[in-house]
């Protein structure tokens, strides 16, 4: 049985070592169960791990929880509170709040859309890219444009 935290993708279920009972973050009582639920670096009884808005139980098998702003939320309340992250600067389509994104200055992109706008080379976290007139460019296309006098430096 494995329950995952959607924000971090880390397992929320672990076996409690014998003799060292953890305290529940919800009720402050010792957790005597064999398995521990962990969310926001705290331990919970199955009945105590609930959505901060609607109080629905999130400790059951198959449940999914979301964390943001130190809140533990069910999917419905997460989407209701945090909605969307806006529109993708490349394709203009809506980006759901729970989707991973790439950011460049004030622009937000789907992971699949975060690419050089001239050659379509995709970027990963840590890759060097250049931003000119809200256009994302790879190093090769940027340097070529700079040699031609097309672009001035705005390294990210």
UniProtKB/Swiss-Prot annotation:
InterPro entries: LMO_RBTN_TF, Znf_LIM
SMART domains documented for this protein: LIM
Secretion signal span: none
Keyword Zinc: yes
Molecular-function annotations in GO: DNA-binding transcription factor binding; metal ion binding; transcription coactivator activity
Highest taxon of source: Eukaryota
Matches recorded under SUPFAM superfamilies: Glucocorticoid receptor-like (DNA-binding domain)
One annotated Gene Ontology cellular component of this protein: nucleoplasm
Principal cellular location given in the protein's record: nucleus
Disease (UniProt): A chromosomal aberration involving LMO1 may be a cause of a form of T-cell acute lymphoblastic leukemia (T-ALL). Translocation t(11,14)(p15;q11) with TCRD.
PANTHER family: LD11652P (PTHR45787), RHOMBOTIN-1 (PTHR45787:SF2)
Name of the protein in question: Rhombotin-1
Taxon lineage: Eukaryota, Metazoa, Chordata, Craniata, Vertebrata
Gene: LMO1
